[in-house]
A protein has these predicted regions:
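Fe-S-dependent hydro-lyases/dehydratases of central metabolism
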Residues: 1-197
Length: 197
């Protein structure tokens, strides 16, 4: 059968650390993230299969590397996630273990989808973008979950235990609650189970 369960994210940890699995340029579209061809979109109800095509137009080794990495981060330039509002463009990276995207800027709708699937979207400046490389180890030094709950905007990231930079989270109170829960699906599930008595 070609239908699988939608992935439900885990509640956000205090720590986010992982390898930069892919460094991308400006204007990466949702079509780059999940190609919109019929032979691929036929799997849109099977996230395990669909995720195999994640970012294949940028790097066809990405999905396999991400699955074996046990978590990681993406780095991008300006306007990450522009184009159509395809939820799968956030759902598939989440399934592959992506915990954060560090980008110079985000397309608004895709950024909302990153929140909805529990992926932390952090804005970085051009200098940080130029300096960070694919394969680097990135740690969000700030205790992530408590900082999000407290409404913090600035987060310190450490790269290769060598240098640090500041990244910024621009999020509403509702988006912060969704992130903390591990995504909209888990938040909704928690709310329903909590109200069920």
């Amino acid at each position: 059968p070609n239908i699988g369960e939608a992935p439900i994210g885990e509640p956000l940890d205090a720590e986010i650390e992982g390898e930069v699995l892919l460094k991308m340029t400006d204007n990466i579209t949702t079509d780059h993230i999940i190609p919109a061809t019929s032979d691929i979109l036929m799997y849109r109800s099977n996230i395990r299969k669909l995720s195999e095509f994640t970012l294949s137009r940028v790097d066809d080794t990405f999905a396999e590397r991400a699955l074996h990495a046990d978590g990681g981060v993406l780095v991008a330039g300006e306007n990450y996630g522009q184009g159509s509002s395809r939820e799968h463009a956030a759902m598939c990276p989440q399934f592959l273990g992506i915990e954060a995207v560090l980008a110079q800027s985000f397309a608004r709708i895709h950024k909302a989808n990153l929140f909805n699937f529990g992926i932390l979207p952090l804005a970085i400046d051009e200098e940080t973008y130029e300096r960070i490389e694919q394969g680097d180890d990135v740690e969000v030094v700030t205790d992530v979950a408590p900082a999000i709950a407290a409404g913090e905007r600035e987060f310190t990231i450490r790269v290769n235990d060598d240098w640090e930079a500041t990244a910024e989270l621009d999020a509403s109170e509702r988006e912060r609650r969704i992130l903390e829960a591990g995504g909209k699906l888990r938040l909704t599930k928690e709310q329903y189970s909590g109200s069920g008595g």
